[in-house]
Amino acid sequence: MSSAIQLRGLAWDHRRCWGPLEASVPAYRALQPDIQVAWNRRSLWEFGEGRLDGPAADYDLVIYDHPFVGEVARDGLMLDLMRFLSVDQIASFA
């Protein structure tokens, strides 16, 4: 039985979002082999036309585009990721 942590992520479907995300996956998997993230994509239009709290409730990780960040912050839909990382994990991003 696998002890890997399985997370669900949602990103907006534009190369500016998923390009860097996909490029970072191999390095992240090498550093964190016990954490698996299954990424889905949603059009920016779908983000703009729908409620933003839906994806926040349905996914572990959500990448919002900048026009929505104010609403996301106002509605408390973000958590400080640093609370969930070890000192070594944070240092690996430097």
Task: Label each PLM-derived region with a short phrase.
Residues 1-69:
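Conserved N-terminal structural module of periplasmic/extracytoplasmic solute-binding proteins
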